[in-house]
Every structure is written in structure tokens, then in C-alpha cells.
């Protein structure tokens, strides 16, 4: 099992949780970004810097993810591709993407994109909170416990 992180937009507090989990469980945590990002020295934590460009990091993750892996991303199309390959995907707020909910998420994303392109201001996501951090940590622990059996 490996943890794949869509690292460009992942909050630092979530990266820290992932680093601790990788060390504790001795599993690989791979951060993929199109710019250099700092990581702690560890044999369990790696970074992959890909070229800049639309969906380059996402495509790298999809091309390399295996069925037993877990991907952390807020990118709904990436999560959809990961699920198609049979791997798990969660967002930094702890929400598990599933075959059952990903189509609805994609539809809502596309709808909001259409609203924004027509000039309607839709606002952004809510501020990342302590509650979000806790939800992520709880979901991660649950999924890792299931996968490590």
C-alpha cells in the first residue's frame, strides 16, 4: 500500500498527518507536485516533481496508482480516475470518494464551473478548520486499518 498525495493544493496540516502515518506504519507516502515541496527526511516519504502543465501531476498519479493504494486529493476528476482504477481516494476534509458519490460530485463541479463561467460568483470552499483536520485523521486511520489487515 502507498499513499499518493496531490500535493500542490494539499494543506500542510494534512501533509503532517500523512507523514506521521507513513512513519508509524512504515508505508510509502509519495507527494506529487509541479514544483519543489519540502518533505522531512524519511525513507518512507518521497516527492515527485512533474513538469508544469494542465493535469500533469494528476496523470502521473493515475498512471502509477495501484488497486491497494490511497490517494489524497481535492481534485474530483482525479478522484474519479483513481476510483475507476479500483484504488481509494479521500479529500483533505476526510470525505471518502466512492463509485456511488463521485458522479454526483462531478456533476456539481461541472455545474459550479458553468455558473462561474457565466459570471455568477459562487464563492469558494469554507476555511479549513480543526474539525476538517480531525475528520481527515479519523477517515485516514479507518482506511489504513482496513487496508493493513
From Swiss-Prot:
Origin species: Marinomonas sp. (strain MWYL1)
Protein name, as recorded: UPF0178 protein Mmwyl1_2258
Similarity field: Belongs to the UPF0178 family.
A Pfam family of this chain: DUF188
Amino acid at each position: 500500500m502507498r499513499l499518493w498525495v496531490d500535493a500542490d493544493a494539499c494543506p500542510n496540516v494534512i501533509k503532517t498527518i500523512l507523514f506521521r502515518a507513513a512513519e508509524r506504519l512504515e508505508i510509502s507516502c509519495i507527494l506529487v507536485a509541479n514544483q519543489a515541496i519540502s518533505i522531512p527526511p524519511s525513507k518512507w516519504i518521497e516527492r515527485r516533481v512533474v513538469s508544469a502543465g494542465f493535469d500533469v501531476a494528476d496523470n502521473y498519479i493515475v498512471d502509477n496508482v495501484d488497486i491497494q493504494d490511497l490517494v489524497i486529493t481535492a481534485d474530483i476528476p482525479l478522484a474519479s480516475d483513481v476510483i475507476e482504477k479500483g484504488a481509494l481516494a479521500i479529500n483533505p476534509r476526510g470525505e471518502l470518494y466512492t463509485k456511488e458519490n463521485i458522479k454526483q460530485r462531478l456533476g456539481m463541479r461541472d455545474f459550479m464551473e458553468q455558473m462561474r463561467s457565466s459570471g455568477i460568483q459562487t464563492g469558494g470552499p469554507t476555511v479549513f478548520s480543526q474539525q476538517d483536520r480531525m475528520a481527515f485523521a479519523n477517515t485516514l486511520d479507518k482506511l489504513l486499518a482496513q487496508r493493513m489487515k
